């Protein structure tokens, strides 16, 4: 489990990105880069790093499921992920 402060920070960053998304899009399209530069640093989506929705773990993130590989494996073995089954060939 990640530190609670990191998880809270990530949620705050996601909210900032969402809040400034439209303004950022219009400023970029109009080429008003000086005003774009004055926006909060954390409002750019490139600063976000994907984290597991359940544990907050930043590494081993599976984008399709929104969770880390470890938590994915646990839930898949328990049969709690619909449509996921163990592969065999």
Curated annotation (Swiss-Prot):
InterPro entries: Ribosomal_uS14, Ribosomal_uS14_bac/plastid, Ribosomal_uS14_CS, Ribosomal_uS14_sf. Coiled coil: none annotated. Keywords: Ribonucleoprotein, Ribosomal protein, RNA-binding, rRNA-binding. The keyword Ribonucleoprotein applies. Gene3D superfamilies: 30s Ribosomal Protein S14, Chain N (4.10.830.10). GO terms for cellular component: cytoplasm; small ribosomal subunit. PROSITE patterns: RIBOSOMAL_S14 (PS00527). It holds the Pfam family Ribosomal_S14. One of its GO terms (molecular function) is rRNA binding. The keyword rRNA-binding applies. Transmembrane segments: none annotated. GO terms for biological process: translation. Part of the 30S ribosomal subunit. Contacts proteins S3 and S10. PANTHER family: 30S RIBOSOMAL PROTEIN S14 (PTHR19836), SMALL RIBOSOMAL SUBUNIT PROTEIN US14M (PTHR19836:SF19). Belongs to the universal ribosomal protein uS14 family. HAMAP family: Ribosomal_uS14_1 (MF_00537). This is Small ribosomal subunit protein uS14A. The gene is rpsN.
């Amino acid at each position: 489990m990640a530190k609670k402060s990191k998880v809270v920070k990530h949620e705050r960053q996601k909210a900032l990105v969402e809040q400034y998304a439209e303004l950022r899009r219009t400023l970029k399209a109009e080429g008003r880069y000086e005003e774009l530069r004055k926006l909060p640093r954390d409002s750019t989506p490139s600063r976000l790093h994907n984290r597991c929705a359940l544990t907050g773990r930043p590494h081993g993130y599976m984008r399709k499921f929104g969770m880390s590989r470890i938590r994915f494996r646990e839930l898949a073995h328990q049969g709690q992920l619909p449509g996921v089954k163990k592969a065999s060939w």
